[in-house]
Every structure is written in C-alpha cells, then in structure tokens.
Design a protein with these regions (language model features):
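Rossmann-fold NAD(P) dinucleotide-binding segment
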Residues: 212-227
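NAD(P)-binding Rossmann-fold cofactor-contacting core
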Residues: 158-181
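Adenosine-phosphate binding glycine-rich loop
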Residues: 9-16, 236-308
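N-terminal ligand-binding/catalytic initiation module
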Residues: 1-116, 125, 135, 308
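Glycine-rich Rossmann-fold phosphate-binding loop(s) that bind the pyrophosphate
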Residues: 143-145
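Short helix-loop-beta connector
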Residues: 131-138, 160, 224-225
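Short acidic low-complexity segments
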Residues: 186-201, 218
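Short glycine-/small-residue-rich Rossmann-like dinucleotide-binding loops
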Residues: 208-210, 233-234
C-alpha cells in the first residue's frame, strides 16, 4: 500500500479533520497511559544526521517502533527550514514505513507530513489539558506554519478558545492563519512582535524555524503566572525557542527525556531539572482523576516527538 501526500489530504476530507484529531487524542492518551503502566514499550531515542556544513540547514532522523507479533513502523522525517521559500514544500516532510513481523516485508508507505502535524497537535492538546489552567481561553502562537494549524486544532478540542494572538516573521503567513483554521470561531489578532502575542495568554505555542544559536524567540517578561508553554520547534542541538530562565523557574514536562536533553528545550538543563514525563502525568490523571496543582504555575511542555 502506498499513500501519498494527496491521499492523506483526501482521507482528512473523507473522514473529517475533527474526527481524526479527536481519535488521535483519544488513542494517544490511552497509549501513553499504557506506556507508563508497563503495557507498552517506550521507544528508543531517535537517531539521524545534521544536513550540510552550516548550522540550521536541517536534520533527517529515524524513529522506529515495533509492536510484538504485528510489525515495525519506521518514520523517517526531515526538517528543512528553507523548504517552503525555496522549494514550495513544508519545512517538515517524511515517510512512514510499515514492516510485517511475519515476513519482514515492507507492507505500506505513507507520506508523513500530515500525520506528523496531527500527532504533534494531539500531543499538545493532551499536555495542555493536564498542565494549563482549566478554562484557559487566550492562546498565543509564535510561528504560523503548517504545525500551527494542527496545534490550534488540538487545543480547540481541549479548550474553548476565544482569542488567538499570532506572530510570525512572515506577516502574510500570520494574516492567513485565520482562514486556515476554520475549525474555530476564536478571534484572531496578528501581533507585531512575539511579546505582544504572549501578553495575557493562558497558553503559548512556539512553533518556529529559528536557526541554532539564534534563539530564544520570546523573552522572560510579562508572562502570566499560570502560563502554560508548548515548545515544539527545538529539534537539533543548539536550537532553542525559550530563555533558560523560563525553564529554570517552570515546572518542566517532556515527552522523551533522552531526546529532550539532546535536542529539545531541555538541552540547556541538567536531568534533575526535568520534573515529569508526559506518560506519567497521563497515567496519574487516569488513575486518580484529579487536577494537577501545577495548573496555577508556569509550566513548559518540551515536545520533541517520538515513535508510537
């Protein structure tokens, strides 16, 4: 079976974006709880290569996951920050390859661009539902590319958003976000700078293509005491979106400790400064059905992405 980018777009239309996002959130939440409960294995850290001689040209990484007696799925994903401007392609592209456990044969190939964006948005929805203040309604976005759409889509399922403030270095891209997000009736405001977008926000998503060494993209100034931050843009050594001071005073949750320390926001921290792993919070919430006390303090979710 071969599913192209066009095929995945068509599936979204046939099944419905809301239905797919809700199902992804539900299955991911269940799966994370199963990892924490010992019913599923945690995937190994991803491996890959930095592209080119200069920092910021991109990376290509491999993310494997095997289900016993079923098969192995290998996602190869490439991050090329200039892809959109030079090749009219998304900055994140890749492929999902499914191998049979019985025969070892390649059984299916699927373009990974849309599934990756949906999965990342679903993870943000889960992390935010646990760490953001209940009733959060003001969302800030720094970065308005493809990922920003599914980030907002996931959040729209978990929260009743009424205002979205967006900043992007490309003003046209920021202006176009409203029409790309027909799933929400929230009011959209385009900010002149990142700090204006963040001012008064309950939830912040940073989804940028900042070059290694060029961050952070926001300052540690005038942040709401209860602000929850989802940082999804850090994916290689030297590339960070947040000031270290935010991480050092926040409750920090990661999706994969080894990856976060190697290439996520937490690459500037020591292991003991990481407070939680997402699957443990999901498992705890499922077992005890209680609100976490961290929802009233500054929290950060360091999202690096992992096979599942």
């Amino acid at each position: 079976m071969v599913l192209s980018y066009s095929d995945t777009r068509r599936l979204l239309e046939l099944v419905g974006k809301d239905a797919i996002m809700r199902e992804t959130v539900s299955r991911l939440r269940q799966g994370l709880a199963e990892v924490a409960g010992g019913k599923r294995q945690k995937c190994p850290p991803r491996s890959g290569f930095v592209i080119g001689d200069d920092a910021g040209e991109g990376v290509i990484v491999n993310m494997p996951y095997r289900q016993d007696r079923e098969g192995m799925t290998l996602k190869t994903i490439s991050y090329k920050p200039l892809n959109n401007s030079t090749n009219w392609l998304p900055t994140v592209v890749g492929a999902l390859n499914r191998y049979s456990d019985e025969t070892g044969e390649l059984a299916a190939i699927c373009d990974a661009t849309i599934p990756t964006a949906i999965r990342t948005g679903a993870t943000t929805a889960i992390a935010s539902s646990l760490l953001a203040r209940p009733g959060a309604h003001a969302v800030a976005l720094v970065g308005a590319g493809l990922q920003s759409v599914t980030q907002l889509h996931g959040l729209s399922i978990a929260f009743d958003m009424d205002v979205v403030r967006v900043y992007d270095i490309n003003a046209v891209r920021a202006q176009s976000l409203r029409e790309r997000c027909a799933f929400t009736h929230a009011r959209f405001e385009v900010a002149d700078n990142p700090q204006t977008a963040v001012d008064g926000a309950d939830i912040l998503v940073t989804a940028t293509s900042v070059r290694p060494g060029a961050g952070p993209v926001v300052r540690d100034e005038h942040l709401a005491e209860h602000l929850h931050i989802n940082s999804i843009g850090s994916d290689e050594p030297g590339k960070t979106e947040l000031p270290r001071s935010i991480l050092e005073r926040a409750f920090v949750c990661v999706d994969h400790i080894e990856q976060a320390l190697a290439e996520g926001e937490c690459q500037v921290l020591d292991p003991h400064q990481i407070d939680a792993v997402l699957e443990d919070l999901v498992f705890d919430a499922a077992c005890h059905e209680r609100q976490l006390p961290q929802t009233e303090q500054l929290t950060v979710f360091d999202s690096t992405g992992f096979a599942f």
